[in-house]
Amino acid sequence: LRIAPVKFDAALVGKILTRGLPEMLSQLTTPVTILCMNLTLIKYIGDDGVNAYSIIGYIISFAYAIFMGVSEGMQPLFGRSYGDQNEEDLHYFLRAGVIVSFGGSAVVYGLIIALGGVICAMFGADAPATAISVAAIPRHGWAFLFASMNTILSSYLYSTKRTRESAAVNILRGFIFTPLCIVLISAVSSGAAVWYAVGVAELISFLCAMFITRRSERGGVRFSED
């Protein structure tokens, strides 16, 4: 290693920014979801709903940290297999990533249902917020199952130089389906089904992500040399 002047390369910077765009969009999904949920809960449930969702928000942050950890751990495996032009290994690691993510999210879902009251007590929730949280966790938490797989599919796509496809998945997921589902489902049910909205959005996003992935691999994975 040695210290040397670095020559600015606009093309390289542009490529780095382009490759990193899907990850940025993925990271923005959670705050967009939280914002939309809070605005909707204020309208239909009130302060107690927002207090309850603040607790659920902590759980979401923890769960999504697990998903992101798995997806980031899979990136070098995807990248190495792509660089070796080994389609068999690529699909093997994709299946493994989906299984690990789905299994982990299922464990998290089971734990938060079983320990909902304990978790609320840890965060000092009052009685109304605890009651709402305990009732809402099973309705909202199943979104983790599909969110985990969406995260892996996005990671798989941008790790194999399918930046546009990965960006499309994250835009659909975080900026179209989630806000629309929260607003529309809440409006139709007068707020009664608001807790199911994110799960529905993640399910639709997963179906779209699968379609985009399979379409991009029609005829096999296309390997790029650049």
Write out the residue ranges for each language-model feature.
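Alpha-helical transmembrane segments of multi-pass membrane proteins
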Residues: 61-63, 127-153, 179
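Hydrophobic faces of transmembrane alpha-helices in multi-pass small-molecule transporters and flippases
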Residues: 5-36, 41, 62, 66, ...
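Hydrophobic alpha-helical transmembrane segments in multi-pass membrane proteins
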Residues: 23-35, 39, 68, 100-113, ...
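Small-residue-rich hydrophobic transmembrane alpha-helices
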Residues: 52-110, 114-116, 147-166
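Short alpha-helical transmembrane segments in multi-pass integral membrane proteins
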Residues: 1-21, 78-143, 184-226
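Short runs within selected transmembrane alpha-helices of multi-pass transporters and secretion channels
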Residues: 68-71, 140-159, 165-177, 193-210
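Alpha-helical transmembrane segments of multipass membrane proteins
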Residues: 35-40, 62, 152-156, 179-184, ...
